[in-house]
């Protein structure tokens, strides 16, 4: 894998300063990138002092079956398995969401099945979305001992889409009680009637009330209130609220994911073009709010509903088009395209760092050094 664990930041900077920078400014700028600052001269000489390096994410070095799109990560408790649910493959399990498991803390992954097979598939979905072949972008959340799996049914280029729901009492496929139960439709969108697209669910629980973000292109990212224990809409007649948009056509924003940390609600989104292999331009951005309903703003105070967004992770080297993200217990999961392997898709997982202002950092120390020049 190209994402490797980070080593410590160097104590001093070696190598030439880029010619494009003024020599004095260039040295100070480059030293600051690795946590080194120059003190005023004392007794005729400069003294180099170290300061804590900027926060950096840790990329897990992954192995095993990593061919996933739109991973929904579930980080297990200590000693327990981790799971990733991802977009289905039409050739496997009738295109149902795929399931992978790790028993070594999220580093080695094996495929352990699909959410349904021929005898258990939700047949109503095929009537709701004619032509659907595989099922996209699952989301998995737990409430009161029940696991809720949200999935999307759609076809490329259309907003005739539906988000469906299945539940289970366990994620362990080896448990005798393991069985996914169809709970029907959560929300749908219809061409010519709805200016949003019912795919890409992301759910967060706020003091016992679940909220679901969803959306792709069209009118951008929407938010609706759900209700436990059903896990469906609290008010089927309520209109979704727009919480993120690129404003202009084609409004290339999707894959919302909501997470709470230290009194802030964070909205992670993917922007631009997915699923083009090495030509993908996917990238991730984030905003935050004190209220789950928004407004979500970036570091500069720009509203995500008005085109704002704090950059989080983008193409670097052979890691192309990272996006389709989820978040679980401090870890960010996403897919990316490996330019060194012909643009094949891969799973990525990073333990996020957080800066002094409470913003997530997804870049590694190595990437930050490369960005610094």
Model region roles, listed by residue range:
Residues 1-29:
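Terminal targeting segments of Actinobacterial cell-envelope proteins
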Residues 8-10, 33-37, 262-263:
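N-terminal trafficking/processing presequences and adjacent post-cleavage segments
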Residues 16, 22, 54-373:
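Carbohydrate-active catalytic/glycan-binding domains of CAZyme proteins
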Residues 21-25, 38, 49:
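Intrinsically disordered, low-complexity sequence elements enriched in Ser/Thr/Gly/Pro
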Residues 27-38, 43:
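Sec-dependent N-terminal signal peptides
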Residues 39-59:
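C-terminal region of N-terminal signal peptides and the immediate post-cleavage residues
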């Amino acid at each position: 894998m190209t994402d490797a664990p980070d080593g410590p930041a160097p104590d001093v900077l070696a190598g030439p300063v880029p010619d494009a920078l003024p020599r004095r400014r260039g040295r100070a700028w480059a030293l600051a990138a690795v946590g080194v600052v120059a003190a005023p001269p004392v007794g005729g000489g400069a003294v180099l002092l170290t300061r804590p390096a900027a926060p950096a994410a840790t990329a897990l070095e992954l192995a095993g079956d990593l061919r996933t799109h739109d991973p929904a990560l579930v980080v297990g408790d200590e000693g327990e398995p981790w799971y990733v649910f991802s977009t289905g493959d039409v050739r496997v399990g009738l295109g149902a969401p795929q399931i992978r498991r790790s028993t070594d803390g999220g580093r080695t992954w094996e495929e352990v099945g699909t959410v349904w097979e021929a005898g258990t598939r939700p047949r109503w979905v095929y009537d709701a979305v004619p032509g659907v072949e595989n099922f996209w972008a699952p989301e998995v959340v737990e409430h009161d001992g029940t696991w809720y799996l949200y999935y999307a049914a759609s076809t490329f280029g259309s907003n005739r889409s539906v988000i469906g729901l299945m539940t289970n009492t366990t994620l362990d496929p080896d448990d005798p009680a393991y069985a996914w139960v169809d709970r029907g439709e959560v929300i749908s969108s219809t061409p010519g009637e709805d200016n949003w697209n019912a795919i890409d669910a992301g759910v967060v629980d706020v003091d016992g009330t679940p909220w679901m973000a969803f959306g792709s292109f069209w009118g951008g990212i929407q938010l609706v209130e759900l209700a436990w224990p059903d896990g469906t809409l609290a008010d089927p007649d309520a209109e979704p609220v727009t919480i993120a948009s690129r404003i202009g056509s084609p409004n290339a924003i999707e894959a919302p994911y909501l997470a709470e940390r230290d009194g802030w609600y964070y909205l992670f989104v993917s922007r631009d073009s997915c699923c083009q292999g090495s030509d993908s331009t996917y990238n991730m951005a984030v905003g935050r709010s004190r209220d789950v309903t928004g407004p979500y703003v970036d570091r500069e105070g720009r509203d995500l509903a008005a085109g704002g967004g704090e950059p989080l992770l983008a193409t670097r080297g052979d890691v192309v088009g990272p996006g389709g993200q989820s978040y679980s217990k401090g870890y960010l999961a996403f897919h990316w395209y490996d330019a060194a392997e012909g643009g094949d898709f891969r799973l990525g997982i990073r333990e996020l760092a957080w800066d002094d202002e409470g913003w997530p950092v997804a870049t590694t120390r190595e990437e930050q050094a490369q960005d610094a020049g």
